[in-house]
């Protein structure tokens, strides 16, 4: 939402500032840009301004048309934002989608031929041209010669059928076109294939939708290990067996029992960090306390594994449960470690909860803590005494000569984590040389862990993670810095089995900022040994019976 808060629509000045922040600078825009098109304005003044900017003439004529037609802010804002982005060239930094049939019908009800024409023109601009650019960028598509547009067209044909006919239709289609099934099962949802799509197709959204159809059609057998809405899954079992818990930290599920105002922030480490890096998780908690936040913590998963398995309804219910816990505790801020977690939650609650990437919070609050400590700044805004700034900001950074930052697939369009991590490195670790990969930011590669692909075709995961490692080696950097803890896990796992010359020192950004390392050798040893130890029979009965 360009107007990130309802109050931002109360006067033109705030409206203009909000639009500029979201559309032009993108410095503090929400996670999912598709939401920014969903309701770019929340009242008629904002809508008037956007329509005027979009078409490059005085806002009043078009604004009067929109405001007099009863079109919802959802459809109107979506259309205006789409046209605005096309006009100004901001589309490439924005996640967009076409208006749905229902939204087009709503616009048609406004009885405005011009508005109907513009909405269909905007949709046409996002129609796949089958240029095969995505095919050439992805081995999963290249081998069978598919493109994302063909996959979407097949999906649309299935979805046009009555719901009770879809499972049989999907089974028949995949039986006759196994190459398509194989490609869809090997998709990591990374979005690399459509990062430069000329018509703004978004592969992850469409590819993931097929998983739900596969589940409904009996073509996909989920693993109980990753059913994170159950009491027992791989992460909760690991924590229970090895005694990993946080009794000293108030859990989100219990936060509502405390006095109102006790908590304003929920820390969401994500399933990997909270399970495999308890000391680092606690260190982040100490920083949150020192930084003045009243926080509790959730040890839940964001539900991404459920989405990969095709359980969309279960994933939505799981996230809704977490959202209800947040609202019950009166919390207004969620701090996420992983870009993927932030993205999963944003569509549900970005209008109500401020979802902030942890590195962005560290950078912003660190500056405030510097000011409070009286740290002097240079003319460029950087601290004169870096050591004093580091102490004031509550960090304890590692000493490494050079790094290369591996941007997350989930940060591809948003870029908030990547900008903030690089910002922290430059501000508090200026002695560290940042050597950028050729494939970075929007063009970042995939580690191969997404979409639960490793369980179906581990070769894809291995090829992709080694591509990242090779790219990192080519920069000459000493250390590869990851954003997603799952990326950290995947690269660490590959390091354990790779030839010595291909091993690279790799750490999550939090390990660098707080000077603590995750002992992955111990983690992987425990993950293997727990199946043959005293808990082995229980694990096998729980997950494979």
PLM region spans:
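Membrane-penetrating hydrophobic segments
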Residues: 41-46
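Iron-sulfur-cluster electron-transfer modules
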Residues: 72-97, 101, 108, 115-125, ...
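Cofactor-cradling patches in redox/metallo enzymes
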Residues: 200, 272-363, 412-424, 435-545
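Hydrophobic alpha-helical topogenic segments used for membrane insertion/localization
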Residues: 48-59
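Intrinsic low-complexity, disordered N-terminal segments enriched in polar/charged/small residues
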Residues: 2-4, 9-10
